[in-house]
């Protein structure tokens, strides 16, 4: 049934903010975000007697968004999570599967209070006051539990298990404090968490962050007596950027005297995946050329965020007189050529066909010196000219600053980082996608 639903298609669109839509509308209009996708599966499968639910996590351990998926209620008392648009159903965990942390399900009946009086306690985050919300993490991780040490507690006697997202702690589980400890049942292993509590209406750190391994917390405890040098390239996990950058391997840049490129000179070839988005390609042509050709690999689309060519002894980029392709461009694609030179590092030109060649007519011959080349990316690399601040997590003290930096290159350097610390790089200039990370063998490892 899931395979059949996939053949009927679904258009992903994240800008909706609507209540659940009815089955007749969704069966006719297959559009929405992950929740609508799950609603379709629920309507169809329940109609033919297949017991499924829709589960979700409120805060993602690895992303900034809430996420829904379908869950088949199995005879093993565990669920089989799936999304019919993504991959076939499987009981086996998938590689690179999204981390969940804690899993919840909206039910039709009022659920028992986790803590007596919690539904009426306005000091508790709304997630835990939802009377129809059920914690079903036990159906995913039935044997995973953790006891954490608390260096700070609140007067209400409650503690939270939190995820650090968009610059703040977001609670995903609640429990009652026992002395200076807190027990949390059914939490996903190999995920990093922050113990926290409510102080004056704000969710604040109550101890050291940790990764759950073998039902025990592996704490990030910074050693302030041992400082190390670090080099930072990003503020957020790579995700699909690895693929986007890798798609440029094999592209060629050539120069020629004539539009037909009867006698081209190879100026540059990308032979390895770029490490960052902002790349200066030094070229050393034998002579001046009027025409420059950008050739994508035969099996790849052009996905180009920024492209500027600079001639010797000229500080301003060359403005091409005309840009054409090796095939007729549609009106939309001709218009989108401007995205390669709009100073927006997220927008990008995407070719209509794989293996496309773009030809830049410079108007007259120039001897090129270098090219600014920026593939499609998420702009979470170090952005030149932006203001950054690096923090380390100090348990109940929260985040401690290690200093501000103005980015003058594609990397930031700090020589005062406590060994073993959990870090957070904040960009004051733009964006909200930021995640905590630690250093391992000189490289950033994001949580």
Residue ranges and their predicted role:
Residues 80-269, 273-287, 362-363, 412, ...:
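Alpha-helical and coiled-coil interaction segments, frequently adjacent to or embedded
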Residues 1-4, 15-24, 29-123:
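Hydrophobic/aromatic-rich core segments of domains that either
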Residues 76, 165-167, 201, 257-259, ...:
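Solvent-exposed strand-loop boundary residues in beta-sheet-rich modules
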Residues 224-288, 300-370, 374-383, 431-447:
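Disordered, acidic Ser/Thr/Pro-rich linker "stalks" and the adjacent N-terminal cap
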Residues 407-410:
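Short coil/turn segments at the loop-to-beta-strand junctions that recur within blades
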Residues 294-300, 425-432:
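Short beta-strand-plus-loop segments that form exposed binding edges in beta-rich domains
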Residues 158, 190, 384-387, 420, ...:
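Glycine-centered loop/turn motifs
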Residues 159-164, 253, 307, 371, ...:
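Hydrophobic beta-strand segments
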């Amino acid at each position: 049934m899931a395979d059949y639903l996939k053949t009927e298609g679904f258009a992903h669109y994240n800008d909706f903010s609507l209540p659940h839509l009815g089955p007749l509308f969704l069966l006719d209009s297959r559009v929405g975000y992950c929740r609508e996708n799950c609603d379709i599966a629920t309507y169809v499968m329940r109609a033919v007697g297949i017991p499924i639910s829709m589960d979700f996590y409120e805060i993602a351990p690895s992303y900034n968004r809430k996420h829904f998926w379908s869950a088949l209620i199995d005879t093993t008392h565990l669920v089989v999570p799936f999304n019919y648009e993504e991959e076939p159903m499987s009981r086996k965990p998938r590689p690179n599967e999204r981390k969940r942390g804690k899993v919840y399900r909206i039910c039709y009946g009022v659920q028992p209070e986790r803590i007596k009086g919690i539904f009426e306690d306005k000091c508790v985050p709304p997630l835990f006051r939802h009377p129809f919300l059920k914690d079903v993490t036990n159906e995913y991780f039935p044997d995973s539990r953790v006891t954490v040490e608390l260096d700070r507690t609140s007067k209400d006697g409650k503690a939270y298990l939190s995820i650090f997202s968009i610059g703040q702690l977001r609670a995903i589980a609640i429990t009652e404090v026992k002395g200076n400890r807190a027990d949390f049942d059914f939490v996903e292993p190999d995920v990093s968490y922050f113990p926290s509590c409510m102080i004056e209406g704000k969710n604040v750190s109550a101890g050291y962050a940790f990764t759950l391994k073998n039902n025990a917390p592996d704490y990030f405890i910074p050693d302030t007596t041992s400082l190390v040098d670090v080099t930072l390239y990003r503020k957020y996990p790579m995700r699909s950027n690895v693929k986007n950058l890798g798609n440029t391997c094999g592209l060629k840049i050539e120069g020629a005297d004539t539009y037909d490129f009867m006698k081209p000179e190879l100026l540059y070839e990308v032979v390895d995946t770029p490490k960052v988005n902002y790349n200066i390609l030094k070229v050393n042509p034998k002579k001046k050329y009027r025409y420059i050709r950008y050739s994508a690999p035969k099996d790849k689309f052009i996905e180009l965020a920024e492209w500027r060519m600079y001639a010797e002894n000229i500080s301003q980029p060359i403005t091409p007189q005309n840009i054409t392709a090796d095939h007729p461009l549609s009106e939309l694609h001709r218009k989108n050529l401007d995205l390669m030179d709009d100073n927006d590092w997220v927008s990008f030109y995407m070719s209509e066909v794989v293996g496309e060649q773009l030809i830049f007519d410079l108007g007259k011959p120039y001897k090129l010196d270098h090219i600014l080349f920026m593939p499609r990316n998420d702009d979470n690399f170090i952005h030149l000219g932006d203001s950054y601040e690096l923090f380390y997590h100090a348990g109940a003290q929260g985040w401690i600053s290690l200093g501000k930096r103005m980015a003058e290159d594609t990397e930031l350097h700090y020589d005062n980082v406590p060994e073993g610390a959990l870090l957070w790089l904040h960009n004051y200039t733009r964006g909200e996608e930021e995640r905590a990370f630690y250093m391992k063998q000189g490289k950033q490892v994001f949580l």
